[in-house]
Structure formats: structure tokens, C-alpha cells
């Protein structure tokens, strides 16, 4: 799932300088009006660090306009070295129609593990609760030592509420392959992004490399005991 395929999870990331190819007589680059109001397209070669957000901003385009023109299957993934057609200078850019908004968590505990999480740069309790698929209130309730939920420190260890009578069927090592994202691994192996992050605190999810080894919990669930 991810080598030098860029992590654009949440479609966020720093913009970097890429390669802009001049307009040609290629039919894909011909001057024509688009849904976003652009009358010109350019070819752009994706470089390390690019995201659709940064590219759209660079050329005053729309994330979903780029997705549409290039028929991209997943707006969260763009391949290093790929050539994209970019409708530039959009008067009505579309940055929402192709981006799904995750549902608010309703669970109050995490099945299996872990019981704690170490804060890293950029974390907020809101984002952490979403990564673990639990409500913000349940995370705050499990950490009464935190006086201000909006003020957490890098390196601080917080409690993650774990469901009683729950387990992960396996916790083992996994080697990253091309295209891997924590969000996809979580869905495939029935765990959460937060659980993967907690067990790989020194791993940057946006800089995964092919062959990199991570710890991966699998099939995390509540366990029901049959009544005789």
C-alpha cells in the first residue's frame, strides 16, 4: 500500500517545489473551461512532500477538481513521480465533494489495547479520540489529571480507556509495502489508527517507507462469554 506513495491522509501536508511541465498540444492540456472556472490546464510532476492540498493551493485549483480531471481513485494518495493535469486559477474550486467526513465516534472505550498513549507534536485530545474511535468526553474522563484539555505537552502520557473483556487476537510485526497508510491498515486488520500509533510512537505516519517494520495489532474486539 505505500512506498514513496505520499501520505496525504486528511489531505494535509507541507507544499514543496515540484516540476511544472509547459503547456503542450496534448489534448489533456488544451485550453478549455472546467467546472471550477479554470480555462487552462498544466502538467505537474509530483515530488516528495506533495499533497493534493498543497498542489491545489500552489496553482489556485481545487482538490476535487484535480481528482476529477485525473480520475484519481483515492484523493488521499498521489504517487511520487506521477504527472497530473492541474486546472489552474479556478474561480470556483471544489475542495469538498470528493473528501469524506468521518463520522463522530460514539464508543467510550477501545477494545484490546493499549492502556496509554504518549503525546507527540501536533496532537490534540480531539484528534487522539478520533484516532482511537472514542468520544472526546470519554478520553477526558479517563484523564482527570489534565486540568486543561486544550493544553497537553509533547511526551506526556495519557490514559486510554480500554474496554473490559476485550482483546486483540494478535500483536505482531508488519513490514510496510507500497501505498500503506495507517488508516487503511486499521480498517484491514480491524484495529484503530490510535492503537497503531500508540504501539509505534517513534514512527511518523506521514513518512512511512517500504520495508519499514511496525508493530501491528489485529482483530481487536470485545469478547463475549457464552452463558452455560
UniProtKB/Swiss-Prot annotation:
Q: What InterPro entries does the record point to? A: LysM_dom, LysM_dom_sf
The family annotation for this protein states:
Belongs to the secreted LysM effector family.
- Read off the Gene3D superfamilies from this record: LysM domain
* Role summary: Secreted effector that enables the plant pathogenic fungus to manipulate host defenses for successful infection. Binds chitine, but not to any other glycan, including the N-linked glycan chitobiose. Outcompetes host immune receptor for chitin binding through intrachain LysM dimerization. During infection, sequesters chitin oligosaccharides that are released from the cell walls of invading hyphae to prevent elicitation of host immunity.
Keyword field contains Disulfide bond: yes
Which residues belong to the signal peptide in this entry? 1-18
Q: Which UniProt keywords apply?
A: Chitin-binding, Disulfide bond, Glycoprotein, Repeat, Secreted, Signal, Virulence
Positions that bind chitin: 51, 53, 76, 78, 179, 181, 183, 205-206, 208
Q: Where is the LysM domain?
A: 42-86, 115-160, 172-216
SUPFAM superfamilies noted in UniProt = LysM domain
Known outcome of mutating residue 51 to R: Results in improper protein folding but does not abolish chitin-binding
Residues annotated as glycosylated are 89, 95, 127, 133, 222
Q: What is the effect of changing residue 181 to R?
A: Does not abolish chitin-binding and stiil suppresses chitin-triggered immunity of the tomato cells
Triggers of expression: Expression is up-regulated during plant infection.
Extra info from the record?
A: In plants, chitin acts as a microbe-associated molecular pattern (MAMP) that is recognized by lysin motif (LysM)-containing plant cell surface-localized pattern recognition receptors (PRRs) that activate a plethora of downstream immune responses.
Q: Which PANTHER family match?
A: LYSM DOMAIN-CONTAINING GPI-ANCHORED PROTEIN 2 (PTHR33734), MEMBRANE-BOUND LYTIC MUREIN TRANSGLYCOSYLASE D (PTHR33734:SF22)
Pfam family membership, one: LysM
> What is said about the domains?
The LysM (lysin motif) domains are small globular domains involved in binding chitin in eukaryotes. ECP6 contains 3 LysM domains. LysM1 and LysM3 domains cooperate to bring two chitin-binding regions together, composing a novel type of binding groove in which one chitin tetramer is nearly completely buried and engaged in many non-covalent interactions, including 12 hydrogen bonds. The LysM1-LysM3 interdomain groove binds chitin with ultrahigh affinity.
The name this protein goes by in its record: Secreted LysM effector ECP6
**PROSITE patterns, per the entry:** LYSM (PS51782)
- Provide a GO CC annotation, any one: extracellular region
Query: Mind telling me which residue stretches traverse the membrane in this protein?
Result: none
Amino acid at each position: 500500500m505505500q512506498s514513496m506513495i505520499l501520505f496525504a491522509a486528511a489531505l494535509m501536508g507541507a507544499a514543496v517545489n515540484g516540476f511544472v511541465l509547459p503547456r503542450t498540444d496534448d489534448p489533456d492540456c488544451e485550453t478549455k473551461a472546467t467546472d471550477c472556472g479554470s480555462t487552462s490546464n498544466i502538467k505537474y510532476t509530483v515530488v516528495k512532500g506533495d499533497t493534493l492540498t498543497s498542489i491545489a493551493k500552489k496553482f489556485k485549483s481545487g482538490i476535487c477538481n484535480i481528482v476529477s480531471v485525473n480520475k484519481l481513485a483515492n484523493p488521499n494518495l498521489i504517487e511520487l513521480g506521477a504527472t497530473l493535469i492541474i486546472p489552474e486559477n479556478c474561480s470556483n474550486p471544489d475542495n469538498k465533494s470528493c473528501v469524506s467526513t468521518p463520522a463522530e465516534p460514539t464508543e467510550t472505550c477501545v477494545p484490546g489495547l493499549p492502556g496509554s498513549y504518549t503525546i507527540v507534536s501536533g496532537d490534540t485530545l480531539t484528534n487522539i479520540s478520533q484516532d482511537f474511535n472514542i468520544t472526546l468526553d470519554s478520553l477526558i474522563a479517563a484523564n482527570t489529571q489534565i486540568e486543561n484539555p486544550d493544553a497537553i505537552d509533547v511526551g506526556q502520557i495519557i490514559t486510554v480507556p480500554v474496554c473490559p473483556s476485550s482483546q486483540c487476537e494478535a500483536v505482531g510485526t508488519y513490514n510496510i509495502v507500497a501505498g500503506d497508510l495507517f488508516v487503511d491498515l486499521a480498517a484491514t486488520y480491524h484495529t484503530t489508527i490510535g492503537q497503531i500509533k500508540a504501539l509505534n510512537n517513534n514512527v511518523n505516519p506521514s513518512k512511512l517507507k517500504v520495508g519499514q517494520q511496525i508493530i501491528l495489532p489485529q482483530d481487536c474486539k470485545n469478547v463475549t462469554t457464552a452463558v452455560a
